[in-house]
Amino acid sequence: MSQQVIIFDTTLRDGEQALQASLSAKEKLQIALALERMGVDVMEVGFPVSSPGDFESVQTIARIIKNSRVCALARCVEKDIDVAAQALKVADAFRIHTFIATSPMHIATKLRSTLDEVIERAVYMVKRARNYTDDVEFSCEDAGRTPVNDLARVVEAAINAGARTINIPDTVGYTMPFEFARIISGLYERVPNIDNAIISVHTHDDLGLAVGNSLAAVHAGARQVEGAMNGIGERAGNCALEEVIMAIKVRKDIMNVHTNINHHEIWRTSQTVSQICNMPIPTNKAIVGSGAFAHSSGIHQDGVLKNRENYEIMTPESIGLNQVQLNLTSRSGRAAVKHRMEEMGYQESDYNLDRLYDAFLKLADKKGQVFDYDLEALAFINKQQEEPEHFRLDYFSVQSGSSDIATASVKLACGEETKAEAANGNGPVDAIYQAINRITGYDVELVKYDLNAKGQGKDALGQVDIVVNHHGRRFHGVGLATDIVESSAKAMVHVLNNIWRAAEVEKELQRKAHNKENNKEIV
């Protein structure tokens, strides 16, 4: 019988570090729920000591997620471990993941320490983490550039201290697959107590070898793989989990291991991460790219028509990609929309049917037929706009031409008030943004603007994603409409609501901190 490979997802921790704009607590929870539905064994959801906001996000996810083990990162620092435990303690069961560098370069230049001191510190911190939970993971940062004999000493000491998972990261994506396999094999040969822990790997893609290194490590005995959906992460990214998962499934003949992942949720989880993180998936991306199952060569097309297995080593359906596209019209009822969402794998908790159906009817009136990709786009926007809105777009109009200065008029609901402004700009989008900024008074700098068609044809929905800089912090906004000017306006209103909500959250955190200090004084 094949052994299980544990899937450890770090999309919300290592993956988020690569984003241009930080995710809100709601967005993180949305991704966490998608990962839970896909069946990841462990999800690393943040670094609680880094900020009050991260602490709150970790705590919220730990409270809600039940079917995956929630994990938080901590340096080999007492405060890090204590704060991680505080954030996680609301979970039924949790993992603390602590780490310290072990390579000669990092020890000498970053830590200004010695290997013996590193081992002593690692042992102390693993024991401290064990005071809070039996599930402690220890990572040897930059293990790929650590001599295997040194690595073996650290690993043996960490296991003796109580670590139940030992992670071997290729932190800078330096090693080759045959080298990495040799490191894992070398640890099995040198560490006498290695059977008391699960060996994990965490690889980066600086040389394009993250997935290859992870698979080589699994073949050599590793039984946990860490990575992120779509491979997002620091620099060139992390190991793409969907690629490792499907490689293990497709090549079970030689890997002789399995995962407990629900493969049919891979496509939707990938899309969720891509949209929320504002990181488009390349067309030629393995497994989840839009061209992953496309056949343009005549020879290939002929072969696929005769037998799909001639040129397809897996099916789109195996990752949950339904290629049968049905269309609905304005005559389709709520029940039909709900039924189609269920057929596409959506649960009622994934969207608000009333709001979705209202948006569906408006779109159907505009373009006649509404396709699956339209419904999915509407459901995504529906989810993003569930939170309370301080600003709401009531009305806009734009006048522009080839030789005219663009002029926009905008009416916004701002809390209980309604305000209107007009402005000129360098094109219709800029004019609308100038008018909106006049109304709100927010000082924002547009740093990124992306427009993507959600579907096919001239009447396709256009999704606009923007990133703005506000007082040194970046925020993401998204808008969806058949009119790209309207999409752009909605994206700016969305980003301003995100800024407003972040300010409200900050006020609440300050209030809690103030109350906590007052309670200390009373005691």
From Swiss-Prot:
Chief location bin: cytoplasm
PROSITE patterns the UniProt entry points to: AIPM_HOMOCIT_SYNTH_1, AIPM_HOMOCIT_SYNTH_2, PYR_CT
Cofactor(s) this protein cannot do without: Mn(2+)
Source organism, top-level taxon: Bacteria
InterPro entries linked: 2-IPM_HCS-like, 2-isopropylmalate_synth_dimer, AIPM/Hcit_synth_CS, Aldolase_TIM, LeuA/HCS_post-cat, LeuA_allosteric_dom_sf, LeuA_bact_synth, PYR_CT
Pathway entry: Amino-acid biosynthesis; L-leucine biosynthesis; L-leucine from 3-methyl-2-oxobutanoate: step 1/4
Alphabetical keyword list: Amino-acid biosynthesis, Branched-chain amino acid biosynthesis, Cytoplasm, Leucine biosynthesis, Manganese, Metal-binding, Transferase
A GO term from the CC aspect: cytosol
Catalytic function, reaction form: 3-methyl-2-oxobutanoate + acetyl-CoA + H2O = (2S)-2-isopropylmalate + CoA + H(+)
UniProt-listed Gene3D superfamilies: 1.10.238.260, 3.30.160.270, Aldolase class I
Known role: Catalyzes the condensation of the acetyl group of acetyl-CoA with 3-methyl-2-oxobutanoate (2-ketoisovalerate) to form 3-carboxy-3-hydroxy-4-methylpentanoate (2-isopropylmalate).
Protein family membership: Belongs to the alpha-IPM synthase/homocitrate synthase family. LeuA type 1 subfamily.
Name of this protein: 2-isopropylmalate synthase
